[in-house]
Structure formats: C-alpha cells, structure tokens
C-alpha cells in the first residue's frame, strides 16, 4: 500500500490548467529548445502540447514560453522569465507537498513502512 500526491491547479471555472504534464512539457522545452521536441519526448501530439501551454498561459495571465520563427538556424521555444519562475515555484510546492504527505502517511499508517 502507498499514498500518492498529485498537485493540480484549477482556474476560477474549476477547469484544470496546470499539473505534472504541463510541468514536464516546460522542462522539456528547456532541454530541447522547442515545444515540438518536448512533445516528442513525451509521445504527445504537438497540437495537444500547444493547447496545454496556451490553456495554462490563459489561466495564469502571462506567457510561459516565447517562440522564434524558423529560418536558417531554425525556430524554437524557450521559457520566459515568468515561465521559469512559475515552473520553479510549482516544482518546489509539489516537492514540499509530497514530503508532507509522506510524513503524514508514516504517522497515520506506521505499519506500512
């Protein structure tokens, strides 16, 4: 037996807009320099990845990514400063919640260690 912690953010209409999927996409953009590359790493369609990012940006009210159009050197995407800050805060909050949940689990179910 185990307990799991899942952090999901909802907007004012109670619509999910940010969780582990969009966070992984943003990390992937940092690693690959493109939304298409990040989506590919996750075996996700580019259109779905774009929709996830756009939904999160609409709910947050600021851009998470900035895209450059192709050309000789090719296009790409990168995180905005606000995007980097949001991702960092999300990951820190998620990790703190996981640790708190683990501690509570051990207190309430000590026989399950």
Regions found by a protein language model. Name each.
Residues 1-14:
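Short, Lys/Arg-enriched N-terminal segment that forms or immediately precedes the first helix
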Residues 89-107:
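Alpha-helical linker/hinge and terminal dimerization helices associated
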Residues 32-40:
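Short helix-boundary/capping micro-motifs
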Residues 43-44:
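Central "turn" residue of the DNA-binding helix-turn-helix
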Residues 67-90:
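Basic, amphipathic "hinge/linker" alpha-helix immediately C-terminal to the N-terminal HTH DNA-binding motif
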Residues 58-63:
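Residue cluster at the C-terminal edge of the helix-turn-helix DNA-binding motif
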Residues 52:
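Residues within the DNA-recognition helix of helix-turn-helix
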